Amino acid sequence: MNLLTTRIDLDAIAHNTRLLKNRVGAAKLMAVVKADGYNHGMDRVAPVMAANGADAFGVATIAEALALRATGITTPILCWIWSPEQDWAAAVEAGIDLAVISPRHARVLVDAPPTSRAIRVSVKVDTALHRSGVDEQDWDAVFTLLRDCGHIEVTGLFTHLSCADEPGNPETDHQAETFRRAIDRARALGLEVPENHLCNSPATLTRPDLHMDMVRPGVALYGLEPIPGLDHGLRPAMTWAGAITVVKPIRKGEGTSYGLTWRAEADGFVAVVPAGYADGVPRAAQDHLRVHVNGHDYPQVGRVCMDQFVIFLGDNPHGVTAGDEAVIFGGTGMSATELADALATINYEVICRPTGRTVRDYTGEGK
């Protein structure tokens, strides 16, 4: 028995992958599995995505890319956060595509001695986010440098949208216009760029006019709606739950947890859930959690501790007892989006939180 578990529904992963693939028509689907598959377990979810329509995969780091390749994934893998000081040649030997995210990165690859296989790259152009990416004033130099290098194969260009989760924000169209200008400039200089992509999850779902050659969704694959208030039929794949360890009485006026910041307004019972800030429950979650036990919701009370938090059961009319499952989010509990709203954050962060002593349990067959 595990005291703290994230249940990952592989059938939900399969459903979401198919749904996205069906929405994008002829465009390819690059499934983003960075951060260990958004904390769902990259080694388990990536094969399901591959079997249900993913044409390629995107990760952040070289270590993630190599780990993904080691699972047996044979489709293209793009890595977009790396340093020239790393052993990037190991990624090339493993057939990993590297993102050119600055002129320096381009120069390092061009000046490198030939490897046993061509270095495959995708050029990330900065179209407004002002993060990683080649700035417009450097396009000509970088495009020409790559064009003239015999041991580099350019797969295309990509960029990242800053405001796609805000439908109607003109910045998305401004970025798309800049991106098209980058594609046109590359081709005018004689650089072949066959596969170009800019759509993240919200743009994949709401901007079919921007699908281009490939889309690059992330959070939607895991069943979370990237645009507040919309419903695209996605199925959340993660449920985070703990097994109650203690149920005990509390008298009116008595407090619980550090500082006794909460006191019972009437006699009743409290229960202890074995999840704390060491496991990803933020200390700031105090008084924001509604925990689901046996078909009923109960408020979290008092301060969140390192290893546990407390819920108030009232007079415990439903007979909650030690060993019962307490759902923190997902499944029958609060959705990740509801919890994110309560914590003034985003659902992306919420699903990345279960860590520490949390054990993953997989359900479904990925079909």
Curated annotation (Swiss-Prot):
SMART domains: Ala_racemase_C. Its cofactor is pyridoxal 5'-phosphate. The active site is at 34 (proton acceptor), 258 (proton acceptor). The modification N6-(pyridoxal phosphate)lysine is found at residue 34. Keywords: Isomerase, Pyridoxal phosphate. It catalyses: L-alanine = D-alanine. It comes from Corynebacterium efficiens (strain DSM 44549 / YS-314 / AJ 12310 / JCM 11189 / NBRC 100395). Substrate binds at residues 131, 306. This is Alanine racemase. One of its GO terms (cellular component) is cytosol. InterPro entries: Ala_racemase, Ala_racemase/Decarboxylase_C, Ala_racemase_C, Ala_racemase_N, PLP-binding_barrel. Pathway: Amino-acid biosynthesis; D-alanine biosynthesis; D-alanine from L-alanine: step 1/1. One of its GO terms (molecular function) is alanine racemase activity. Pfam families: Ala_racemase_C, Ala_racemase_N. One of its GO terms (biological process) is D-alanine biosynthetic process. Belongs to the alanine racemase family.
